[in-house]
Regions:
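N-terminal loops that bind phosphate or other acidic moieties
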Residues: 1-192
Length: 192
């Protein structure tokens, strides 16, 4: 028998790489040939799974405006990789989706100097539809690919994600209205 140990990260407990190694070792102890192959869904830990190395650390604002350091990583081909969760992470000790902002991710992206950029979304404290990011970044610094674990329109995002960020039912409704207004301002795909 052979086994393939391919977990994603276990939030706050183990990275995908460490979880895969431990699972594979457990299989081997049971006499099973095993290979560790960590995976990621575009959220936390994606940069590590892709083999991106830290190129520099920059000071950004967390979701509540407090300073924190976040890495800009690079793949072997020079593509820059940033993870939203490293700039504006979801912290279970501070859940306030009405004030959490994506501005820090914008600050991180604004510091990127590369020919290509990969942005990994997920594991964030905010439900602002990228409004904070847009305050800082008017134009992306390079052709950009976004990795995310769920494709959800702005109009459904608060219902889907705000409760995990601490929103009450009334706050979810308020956030839904705010995101619906924001979606009216966003251009349609393929239109300026």
């Amino acid at each position: 028998m052979r086994a393939l140990a391919s977990p994603a990260s276990l939030k706050g407990v183990l990275s995908a790489r460490d979880a895969a190694a431990l699972l594979a070792e457990g299989f081997r102890r049971g006499g099973v040939e095993a290979k560790a192959l960590p995976i990621a869904d575009g959220g936390e830990g994606t940069a590590e799974v892709l083999g991106a190395r830290v190129r520099e650390r920059v000071r950004v604002s967390d979701a509540f405006g407090r300073p924190r350091d976040a890495p800009i990583r690079a793949l072997a081909d020079g593509t820059a990789v940033v993870e939203a969760a490293e700039a504006i992470p979801l912290d279970p000790r501070r859940l306030d989706p009405l004030t959490a902002s994506s501005r820090g991710l914008g600050e991180l992206i604004a510091r990127v100097e590369a020919d290509r950029l990969l942005v990994c979304l997920g594991g964030t404290a905010n439900v602002d539809g990228g409004a904070g990011l847009r305050e800082v970044v008017r134009e992306l610094p390079a052709p950009t690919t976004v990795f995310c674990d769920a494709l959800v329109p702005l109009r459904d995002a608060a219902r889907r994600f705000a409760p995990q960020k601490g929103a009450t039912p009334d706050q979810v409704e308020l956030l839904e209205k705010q995101l619906a207004s924001l979606s009216e301002l966003a251009p349609s795909p393929g239109k300026p």
